[in-house]
Amino acid sequence: MSRQTTSVGSSCLDLWREKNDRLVRQAKVAQNSGLTLRRQQLAQDALEGLRGLLHSLQGLPAAVPVLPLELTVTCNFIILRASLAQGFTEDQAQDIQRSLERVLETQEQQGPRLEQGLRELWDSVLRASCLLPELLSALHRLVGLQAALWLSADRLGDLALLLETLNGSQSGASKDLLLLLKTWSPPAEELDAPLTLQDAQGLKDVLLTAFAYRQGLQELITGNPDKALSSLHEAASGLCPRPVLVQVYTALGSCHRKMGNPQRALLYLVAALKEGSAWGPPLLEASRLYQQLGDTTAELESLELLVEALNVPCSSKAPQFLIEVELLLPPPDLASPLHCGTQSQTKHILASRCLQTGRAGDAAEHYLDLLALLLDSSEPRFSPPPSPPGPCMPEVFLEAAVALIQAGRAQDALTLCEELLSRTSSLLPKMSRLWEDARKGTKELPYCPLWVSATHLLQGQAWVQLGAQKVAISEFSRCLELLFRATPEEKEQGAAFNCEQGCKSDAALQQLRAAALISRGLEWVASGQDTKALQDFLLSVQMCPGNRDTYFHLLQTLKRLDRRDEATALWWRLEAQTKGSHEDALWSLPLYLESYLSWIRPSDRDAFLEEFRTSLPKSCDL
């Protein structure tokens, strides 16, 4: 009777194994199929077959002779399911937990251990595995899948403890996860073992590459390029698919750039470009490298190529029905040097760099292309500036207007400003309520007054370029009126305002007022009305004491009006200011405002100040 039972059991085991092997072959056939729909259908059928087989095996009491096959089927099911879904879920963790419980059932160790977590279950199973050598290969495959799941979930502490237990290390002897992964030595697969989609050694190689890359990239992001190098070299030398190798080489290039090795950086970036069609990250890094080297032409060419590359649809290969390196990498991080953003974000970088480097004509064209790209897709939402990498839509409009004015296209700039006003002026009646919300700390400081005021400022400058002095003065006055009307009289400090944001906004407001007052003052000077100009320059000094240009224009006007004593006193004040530090310098200004301030910064300032110093009485000489 027992022989008959054994024969029946052996026959069932053979049938289950044949079914597993057939389903694995079916999945591999699907993997090599060029037809997407057929590929997906074959893989899905194989997955359902494995699910049914696993259900049959786990419907019986756990038995050591059957467990190697059961664990193999579990691993094949998890691998195929994760690859089809392109990610891990809680279901896979439950599948692993159920398998561990089944192993312990054979050792009569189930009991209260069911209440324990996965890590505790693994400790128990690995301690029991010395009594079950026939399960060793299957358990190592299951370890590989558990490691993949924990790595993708960033549970590195649990993963390190699992590998320590697996390697027989002393608890706490090594927390170097890379070293623990290298030390892990999966047993060789037996020739007559059930077929698997991926063996333990293959999983180890994937884990080693994925973790080395993750660790290197994290060190690079946190500002430790020297530490990142060794991990990235480890990733490059491992089982590294070409798309990942492009990223690894780009990260290595970024490390060497930050460490002051531009030639090595360039070699890695060239290697990255040769590895595949994912040209975005290496081209962006190349633009940073050329900017650091001061090669503006090469920098802008790299950015232009990047814009074109981002316009080409990505031709991603169909994923293998395996646990791949890409499956274990973290989602894109905005702080990562490999994040090149969208085509519009890159177009903005190109346009702004052209503006900053004096290529106004190119900047104007790039900004107009950018606005067409943004406005064509959908109605953009106007909101406060987000975190890097780019400004909000109104600031893009303002930067574009600056580029047009600088390129001598004042009429086009006026048209653009009118478009911006039509989109933002409707918000102005709500400003008093928005400022009140900001004062109470319930909402962020509103940026709309800055945008609308800056628009009138740029319109004024465009009219100056067109020779319409009266209209220009009117626009500068409108800018000032809005600034003084919109600014809250009392701003509570402390909890009501984010300090950094408040300081940046205050600096921008001060500099915007100074720019409008100086611009209007210069028009009064041009029309021979020095007294009115003096009033504006005096007010600009009061409004923005950290702006040296305000002192210079005031000093020039006082000298023209022959108010010698006041001019001398102001000169001494300016000298004292030169030796001090100013808070305004700590806060970056919007690009459109920086560009505008450079227009009203007199080129002969230093020569005039030196001439004025030499004209002072001897007792005033330094």
Curated annotation (Swiss-Prot):
Subunit structure: Belongs to the multisubunit FA complex composed of FANCA, FANCB, FANCC, FANCE, FANCF, FANCG, FANCL/PHF9 and FANCM. The complex is not found in FA patients. In complex with FANCF, FANCA and FANCL, but not with FANCC, nor FANCE, interacts with HES1; this interaction may be essential for the stability and nuclear localization of FA core complex proteins. The complex with FANCC and FANCG may also include EIF2AK2 and HSP70. When phosphorylated at Ser-7, forms a complex with BRCA2, FANCD2 and XRCC3.
Localization of this protein: Nucleus; Cytoplasm
SUPFAM superfamilies: TPR-like
First and last residues of every TPR repeat: 246-279, 344-377, 453-486, 514-547
GO biological process, one term: DNA damage response
UniProt GO MF annotations: damaged DNA binding
Tissue expression as described in the entry: Highly expressed in testis and thymus. Found in lymphoblasts.
UniProt disease link: Fanconi anemia complementation group G: A disorder affecting all bone marrow elements and resulting in anemia, leukopenia and thrombopenia. It is associated with cardiac, renal and limb malformations, dermal pigmentary changes, and a predisposition to the development of malignancies. At the cellular level it is associated with hypersensitivity to DNA-damaging agents, chromosomal instability (increased chromosome breakage) and defective DNA repair.
Key words, A-Z: Cytoplasm, Disease variant, DNA damage, DNA repair, Fanconi anemia, Nucleus, Phosphoprotein, Repeat, TPR repeat
Presence of the UniProt keyword Amino-acid biosynthesis in the record: no
GO terms under cellular component: chromatin; cytosol; Fanconi anaemia nuclear complex; mitochondrion; nuclear speck; nucleoplasm
Described purpose of this protein according to its UniProt entry: DNA repair protein that may operate in a postreplication repair or a cell cycle checkpoint function. May be implicated in interstrand DNA cross-link repair and in the maintenance of normal chromosome stability. Candidate tumor suppressor gene.
Annotated positions of the Phosphoserine modification: 7
The protein's name: Fanconi anemia group G protein
Main localization category: nucleus
Effect of substituting residue 387 to A: No effect on BRCA2-, FANCA-, FANCF-, nor XRCC3-binding
